[in-house]
Amino acid sequence: MSAESAESTVTGAGLSEPLAAALAAATEDRLVYDLAGIAARHDALRRELPGVQVRFAMKACPLDEVLTALARRGAGADAASPGEVEQALRAGIPVGRVHYGNTVKSDRNIAEAYRLGVRTFATDSVQDVAALAEHAPGARVFCRVATGGTGAVWGLSNKFGCPPGDAVRVLEAARDAGLVPAGLSVHVGSQQMTGEAWHAAAEDLGDVLRALGRRGLRVDHVNLGGGLPALGYRDRRGTPLDPPLDKIFAVIRESMDELRRIHGGPLDFVVEPGRHLVADHGAIRAHVTRLTERRTAGGERQHWLYLSCGKFNGLYEMDALQYRLVFPGHHPDGPYVPAVVAGPTCDSDDAYSHEEGLVPVPATLASGDPVWVLSCGAYATSYTTLGFNGFAPLPHAWADRPEGTGADD
């Protein structure tokens, strides 16, 4: 397919025209973002969950331009370190819309965030509460309740959060230490594919709200965390992931109504989307390093497609996902060969999980041919290495620039 036909094909599949045009115009490797698409996804989320406050999970895409675009739409920031707090403020997010969402933080982290003006902190232990009372006196705290992570591509169920029964004890400790026990939070796992996960989390939150009421504690908000899925991923076998987004939003709305009923009064809600906002609005213009053929230990022929980007420079999550690939200039009707897709480094982990499924690629690919890697806008910048094996991080560009190739210097 020609560059033009490639552009029209991916646009029809959900890639925005500006992003497709920028990829087609690029002559060198780069990560391209569509800021208008990110803003539109944010606005769609606000329509689905009216009245809910959005705190963008900065780790998903810590670029100033993305933060500024979201700030202009009214979003805040879920920051996990003083460095992220500083960046959010520089990008124009008011400090009142920044919370410290990481339950893991040192005394110095707490004191520095408090100095910067942050007054709302996540917690999940009485030890952290004691540190907050000392270094962020009078701060508002919300307690993270652990979830199982079932139904998510990444469960995230071990490092953060306390059992529902312990959340009451943590918030009582916060009250007794002079802090404001302001809320509860959950995280149902990243790229959550089921509505049932939010329903189960809401049931746990309801139990905690009842228990808090019996102890005379009333919170003012519930943070429903991240987990909202991107739409353009494929699983490790290459099957498109098709999250039931309408059902997920319906379950969240019903859950909010039920939690307000249990609470018996006003209750605000917060969400912390990351990949849901940015993944599908970022893509990489890469190139073919080499398409090779060699035999496995069992004697079978196997093709390997080595790209100029991989796990260490843009595709960190390639061990759990397959990203959709587009090959401009190659006809979609073939000939194609099944191949293992891998990155350029001298590291065996820099490859798709090829035991699960091979990827059909044009048999005529040559070194230097362009390749578009779609729906990789989440974690492509934040998870990249600074020069592993001498491969530099990809520059980034913005789809709304006329030439479509304006890279970060």
Regions inferred by a protein language model and the residue ranges of each:
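Structural preference for beta-strand elements that scaffold enzyme active sites
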Residues: 53-55, 74-76, 95-99, 120, ...
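A generic local secondary-structure boundary/capping motif
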Residues: 132-133, 159, 172, 213, ...
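Short glycine-rich, flexible loops that bind phosphorylated cofactors or substrates
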Residues: 130, 150, 380
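Active-site loop/helix belt of alpha/beta enzymes
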Residues: 147-292, 389-391
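Short acidic, glycine/serine/threonine-rich loops at helix termini
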Residues: 67, 90, 110-114, 132-135, ...
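Charged (often Lys/Glu-rich) extended helix/loop segments that serve as interaction or gating elements
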Residues: 251, 261-409
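A charged N-terminal "starter" segment
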Residues: 1-134, 138-139, 176, 180, ...
